[in-house]
Amino acid sequence: HKREADFCSKGNLTNPEISPVEHYPPTNEIKEEATSWEEGNQSDYSINSLTEQIQGPYTPTPIMEYNHLIMQDNKYDVNACNSPLQETDVTKHALHKRDIDRRQRTQTQLKYDHRTNTGDKPLSCSECGKCFSTYHVLARHQKTH
């Protein structure tokens, strides 16, 4: 570090141990290329074909196909009603659908929800006596015996 400090303190910014860097005259190639890009000389076709070569043509995945909300013409569209929606309408539609789903729930589902909310566990294991609120949890427990 002493030698480096000597170079800096003397105002000598060159190091004799390092070979001099070759300097090339500045070129306008990069600037010209950037200018032609900004001017829009690049065709949309070449950009799109490059994208397709990299990513391939767009094909929806099975998850996208069954997604409740899909994009069409840059607007949300709900499969059930096929109407273009604004972002606020998407939220309203989702809330409305949730309310309908709640009304359509079966008595059994409501009974299980009530048990969960109250902590009621009327089902018990015949082997150990441990209590459960749903049949499927009891059945899973009984497999451990």
Curated annotation (Swiss-Prot):
Zinc finger (C2H2-type): 123-145
UniProt KW keywords: DNA-binding, Metal-binding, Nucleus, Transcription, Transcription regulation, Zinc, Zinc-finger
Organism: Xenopus laevis (African clawed frog)
Principal place of residence: nucleus
Organism ancestry: Eukaryota, Metazoa, Chordata, Craniata, Vertebrata
Record protein name field: Oocyte zinc finger protein XlCOF8.4I
Function comment: May be involved in transcriptional regulation.
Claim: Zinc-finger is one of the keywords in the record: yes
Entry's family note: Belongs to the krueppel C2H2-type zinc-finger protein family.
GO cellular component, one term: nucleus
